[in-house]
Amino acid sequence: MHFVRHGERGTKMSEDRRDGNIPVLFVSGDTLPEGWEKSVLAVWEKGGSYPTEYDKEGEAPSLDATMTLVIEKPFEEPRLHRAFPGAIEDLEKYRLEVVDGVHDHWIRPEEGKWTYTYHKRLFDYQVQEDLAGGGEGPFAGVAQMDYLVEKLSQVPYSRRAQAITWMPTLDPKTDDPPCLQRVWCRLAEGTDGELYLNMNTHWRSRDAYKAAFMNMYALTDLQRIMAQRIAERIGREVRLGRYVDVTDSYHIYGSYLEEVEERFLRSIRDRSFEQRTWRSDNAIIQDGIQRGRDQIEQEKKEQG
């Protein structure tokens, strides 16, 4: 398998810029690691070259594209890719941050700390205007995911079951606004007569290499949890349908192109798919998951 080296892409990248059209890419995979791997490769090979607001002097521009990624079987094994840049315990802590809100208490914009978590925006959306104004805004929080469960329990085929994160009164003023913008779900009946929960997520911007895998790992787990909640509500099994991930700016930063080449691409060249992925029931993965949970429990004890 041959990959274009980043140093060989100069002519093509400049042509992409002159074209004036940001590349639009579509990839699909049966499993999460397969889809993520294909998406990073697609941006590497076909992404355009664009500057960002975070570039330092002398750094290469980012590779970037608008990406639609389809995961046909979100919970089929293997669930993990060995080349995602992070520790298993960090992946588990991030999952808990998204689905359980274990870091919602870190939202303290008045102290210069976090302005949001995805869990807080999805499960308790509170309108705010002032970064220095403290935690609560003028209106009661909106439990958007509860609405999503209730709506689909009543009308499985509804097109209104969605939750948003963007807060136009606050986010444009911040240095780190949410990347995730919207979650949309709908139930569909398969030819087997079973109900399947389909989920779409929409992102304004995403680091394809360093963030996307962890994002999708957590969001597909949220999909699983929503399916379970709907099933309990309607008294009928709800299985997982496909997961679709749409990103306006799906990018690989120029500052670490060599890391992608040396770590990610090399693993694809040198290892089989089985060798570069893990099943979630692997003992190494389970140990890492437990370490992540233990670290969260320790955080809670230290907070009192």
Annotated model-derived regions:
Residues 2-304:
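Terminal, non-catalytic protein-protein interaction segments that mediate quaternary/complex assembly
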